[in-house]
Every structure is written in C-alpha cells, then in structure tokens.
Regions:
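Secreted, disulfide-rich extracellular signaling modules
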Residues: 1-140
Length: 140
C-alpha cells in the first residue's frame, strides 16, 4: 500500500541573500558554491502535514515500516560523482512567504536569518535526535 504525503509549504534560503524569501518559487535549491573566496550556500525547507498520517497509523488503517522522500533534480551544474545530502528536522515554525528567487523578490516570510518576517531563528534549538541522509551518485 502506498500513502502519499505532499509538502504543505516549502522555500529555499540563501547565505548571501540572508533576508530574501523564496516561498513561491517553483524550484527548491540545495547548493554550496564558491565565487573566489565568497561562499554561497542554499538550503531547502520543506513542511509536511503529518497529522492525518499519524492518525491513520494509530488507528491501524495504515501500516508501514519505512518511508521515502522523493525529490527530482533539474538544472544541475557541476555535480560531483559522489555527494551526500542530509535532512534534519526544524524545531521552530516558519512562514513560507511570497517571494521568488529572481522575479518577485520579497523579504516577507522565512529566510536565512528569519523564520518569520521579523522573527529570527533560535540558534541551537534543534533536536538532532532524528535525521535522514542520501548518498547519491551524480555527474552528467
């Protein structure tokens, strides 16, 4: 049996654009790029509404022993032959926002610095009890 849960909200955040929001952008970015001595990092935030799934598991309607996160790549450049992507839980609520990467630039919503428009992320508040990772084979 398959049970699909799609993201209820998502956004990419950028080290070099620390207040920019991309909640309405159609692309999620994960990257680490160097421009000379300048490092730019992009991370993706993805929220899944899991309450219905939790209820279905508790009632016995859904039984499962594992889960998969399926992401697709597009416009990849200079991917190394081997790489790892890690997933961590976010311990704070965040606003998806209304911005896009290049067309509708906005600072409303989450960003590298803020989890909501004017609310900073709390540093060191995450629980690293659970995580996920992917070790992929890349290259073009």
């Amino acid at each position: 049996m398959y049970y699909f849960v799609t993201a209820s909200k998502d956004a990419s955040i950028y080290l070099q654009q620390p207040t920019q929001n991309t909640g309405l952008d159609e692309i999620l970015e994960v990257s680490k790029v160097y421009y000379g001595n300048l490092k730019d990092t992009a991370r993706s935030l993805i929220k899944f509404e899991t309450t219905p799934l939790s209820s279905s598991i508790a009632s016995g309607e859904v039984t499962m022993s594992n889960a998969e996160l399926i992401l697709r790549e597009c416009e990849s450049n200079e991917i190394p032959n081997e790489y790892s992507i890690y997933a961590y839980p976010i311990s704070q609520s965040w606003d998806m926002g209304i911005g896009t990467r290049f067309d509708e630039i906005s600072t409303d919503g989450c960003s590298w610095e803020n989890r909501k428009t004017s609310t900073k992320w709390l540093i060191g508040s995450a629980s690293l009890e659970s995580s996920g990772s992917f070790n992929g084979k890349g290259g073009m």
